[in-house]
Amino acid sequence: MAVDVLASEESEESITADWIMKSMKALASRIVGQIGDETEVVSEIPNLTLHRFDEPTKPTGYLLEPSVCVILQGLSAWSLGDNDYVYDATRFFVTSIDLPLIAQILEASPSEPYVGMTLKLDRMQIAQLILDSQLPSLNSGKASRAIELGALSKPLFGAIERLINLLAEPECIPVLSPLVQKEIVFRLLTTECGPKIRQIAT
């Protein structure tokens, strides 16, 4: 019986992963259609920046504010000091302080461009959500790294997709964008990156 349960769980995880990947590709295509040939677009949605590259890039340094970064298509690498990170569309990463990073796009082409998003995180919103949700206290020693990587779940991706889809309904952005961003932050707080995000509010 235990084997059957394990097989069922693995099958469900595989179905969820396949669904997320297909949905990501569809969302990446919509973003490419909206932003055209621009490599970086500060969108009409507050705090949201979209990225698109048609070819790999050289390492480039810049300052990243407290944010969550998600790749919808492609592969990128980030360096901070002696630490290197490589992540793709199955994961996201979070920073809680301003960080001087070196970023490089590793996989991108005209037919399958690199597509990603950066959502700046708001300190006051996080603090209020921590109070409202009554999340358990942090364990000491957690969230010690400057960058935390997390697995992208179906509910979290669903919220991200709803946020980006608001670009097609600009009249809805002022009302719905704050609500969807609040959901995204709440779902991030309940992931393995929750301790890192809580640091923003302290």
Features from the language model and the residues they span:
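A short, N-terminal "cap"/entry segment at the start of jelly-roll beta-barrel domains
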Residues: 1-44, 48-51, 57-58, 140-147
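Short, charged N-terminal helix-start/capping segments
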Residues: 1-14, 50-58, 90-108, 151-168
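Amphipathic alpha-helical segments enriched in hydrophobic/aromatic residues interleaved with Lys/Arg
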Residues: 4-20, 126-183, 187-188, 193-201
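N-proximal short alpha-helices
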Residues: 23, 33-37, 41-44, 59, ...
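A general structural-boundary detector
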Residues: 37, 55, 77, 106, ...
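N-terminal regulatory/effector-sensing and dimerization cores
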Residues: 40-137
